[in-house]
Every structure is written in structure tokens, then in C-alpha cells.
Amino acid sequence: MTTHFMRSYAELCIKTCHRRNIHAMGGMAAQIPVKNDEKANAEAFARVKADKEREATYGHDGTWVAHPGMVELAKEAFDRLMPTPNQIALKKRDDVKVSAADLLRFEPEAPITEAGLRLNINVAIQYIGAWLAGQGAVPIYNLMEDAATAEISRSQVWQWIRSSKGKLDDGRTVSKAMVAAMIPEEMSKIRQLLGSAFGEGRYEEASVIFADLVNNDNFVEFLTLPAYERID
């Protein structure tokens, strides 16, 4: 949320809402408590704390979290930084001057990496596989994910394949062939990660859907459209 276009839309949202005297809600913190890993758990709580402090400082009037275990942390941040019921009158954000160009400034802060490409493939397949089996919210790598995550993942891969800037930091070009080679490798990782739970999802079907989505030269509007066709 600190990249240029994301901060721009967040602050514009606050300004727009407060001009109309309505509440500007912050976003969801996807982190969830991590069992049996004290360091990872502490990192998750630290990320949520920083996220909610940023939202309250920007001028949001409330927020939400993905897990009830994070409610008290979010509440503490807002109670401390927003002692009033809301910030509608206090932070009109007339200082915010956001243009269309600001909202379209998507320059990445870091290069595309093989690890990032693989993570997009892995997470998208995990989510779609669980979605086909009836789950809408899916814990993946200590984050509570919904369809938006899989949408971002498959959209980035689709774009990297077709963009002249779709190159990894080592100079290799992201291609359909590269992604096709990585899909079975990531499937093996998912199978190993989930163990017996692998059979509870529909991951083989998910990998086919993902491959079809990124290989289709016409960008499919929503990944759930072809996925719905596989639901009885």
C-alpha cells in the first residue's frame, strides 16, 4: 500500500469519502496468526500493526482483518491514533492532489524474479484448487486469501508473458514455455506441502484452468468464469 499508485488511490478514497461526510474504510490485513512458529507469528502481528497505523494516519475511519485474532491489534492502533469516533471532520485531506496519471503509475519497485513468478503460479493453483472444492477464503502461506489474490497472480503472469518488460532479473524472458515447465514443478511442491489434504482439493483441474488462463491471448475477465463451468 506504499507504492505510488496504491497510496494515491487510498488517499483519494479518504478525500472523496470525507468530502461527502461518509466513512472511509481501510483495507483487509490478510495476515493470520501462525502456529508453532514464534518468529513468523511475531512478523505477522508486526505487519498488521504497521498496516493499521498507516491507515489511521492517512485518515481512514475504520478497518478490517482476515482473522479474529488480529481484531484487538487493529482496534488498539485505531483507538490510539483515532481517539474520536471517526476522522471525517478532522482529516478532509484537501492536501491530496491525485491525477489520473498517479493512479496509472504502476512502475514495480523490484524486478521480476523466478521466485516471484513461481509464487504466482503456486498461489493461483492452490487457491483455484480449494475454490473448486468449495472454499472461498483459503489460508495460503500464513495469509488468508480470496479470489482477488488468484486474480492478481494469474494476471501478472499473463501480462509478463506478453509484455516487452516481462523479463526476469537474470535476463530470461517470461514465456508460455517457461510457465508451462514450472506448472508441474509447482504442483509437486503443492502436493508435498499439503500432504493428505491434497486430495481434498481439485488441484489438477486448477492447474489446467490456470494454464488456460495464462495461455489465452484474450484476457479472461474473471478466473471464476471458466472455473464455474467445472462446478456441478
Language model feature labels by segment:
Residues 1-232:
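Expand to "…catalyze enediolate/carbanion chemistry for C-C bond making/breaking, isomerization
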